[in-house]
Amino acid sequence: MKPPTRSQNRSDSQAASSQKDQKSNVENQTSLAPPPRPGAPTASDTPDYFNSMHNPFSLEPNPFEQSFGGNPADTPGKSLLPSVAALTSPALPGTSSASGYNWNNSLRSGPLSPAMLPGPTGPNDYFDSIGRGFPTPNESSLRTGLTPGGGGSMFPAPSPNSQALLQQLQNGGATPSTIDFHRTALAAKKNNSNAPTSNPNEQEQAAANMDVKPARPADFTQHDAADAANGLFMLAKGGQANNAPMNHAPMSNDTRAAARRVSQNTNGTSAEDASDHEPAKPAKGKGKKNTAKAPAANNRRKAEDAPKGSNKRSKSSMEMPSDMDDEDDEDDDMKQFPMDTKKMTDEEKRRNFLERNRVAALKCRQRKKQWLANLQNKVELFTSENDALTATVTQLREEIVNLKTLLLAHKDCPVSQAQGLGPLMMNGMSAGYDHHGYNMPPNMGMQPGGIPTQGMRR
């Protein structure tokens, strides 16, 4: 048997070493098994700061998953909002079936629906006078074909939704709502039959009744109910022309003038008729004559009504125009009403105002006098100072002339020749007094804004 070579021994040693390494690796693997996975954390376990598996928020239920996890179910018995078509024209068939609202008895489904009543057409709208504070008493809202901007009718061109309703009203078909409009208009006309107007018929009624005392016509404003009734009446007629002749007085822009004319027609006539049968009572204010003699002596009554302290007002009242006479007549008519407390209050206010004006004017005059006195004192002071300065300037000028004379007299002195003053005195002082003193060149004199010394002499 041959002995093993060196190469075989080397291979056997490598195989043995590899087997030992494998055994050591197996032993290490069996001895260093991975640690078991930690179980689920419980409430008693303290969460680790570096471990995200111990977060307790993962165990809390998510409210959003519970809310939105299932299928959405409608609320049983809920009502849907009406559609846009139902809101615009709820009277159309099929619009009220989608919602649970019943629009049959609503104001939006009748003749006053938004489709029939358009928006405002401008300042001359038909409903512009509703809610006004002081319209003309004889102004009526039952006008057809006279409304400015109405195009010959009360309403502009109707919309297609209300065309059928207008045709039905114009054909003469009286529906129950039309009958109600007629009844409302008649009732409103009956209630407003005794309203104060500017017609002369009420003057005869007031003259026939002697016991009626003049009262202030305060019911000039139209009631909202009457305006609504008149509007419904015109709406029920469907644009038909009004056959009843109506005499409308022109509307005056000055409401105060209208109120004055009405008060003269209603109260003035009744007061004159009552004064023929019973003596007139003296007024509580200043001594004024009765109303029967008032038209004949307007100027005399105005002179008596003027305050005693104001003579200028009484003189100027004799030359007032006719419109001022009307205002005085209105004031006399207003004095007949029980307004003594307010009138005395106004009189006291006027007196206080005049007193304040008098005190303010007195203080103003005193301040003006004081200011004038101070100004006069300042003028006198400045005048005396100016005279003193003028005298000083004159004295200095004379002294300068004397000094020049002395210098000219000593021009041949050896001291002046030694100092070189001889030619200087010959050039600058030989001509006597020079305008530019001290031998200054002409361009170096006083500036244009200055005051020359010769101009100070007075």
Curated annotation (Swiss-Prot):
Keywords: DNA-binding, Nucleus, Transcription, Transcription regulation, Virulence. It comes from Penicillium expansum (Blue mold rot fungus). It comes from the Eukaryota. The keyword RNA-binding does not apply. One of its GO terms (cellular component) is nucleus. The gene is Atf1. This is Transcription factor Atf1. Belongs to the bZIP family. Residues 349-378 are annotated as: Basic motif. Its main location: nucleus. Residues 389-403 are annotated as: Leucine-zipper.
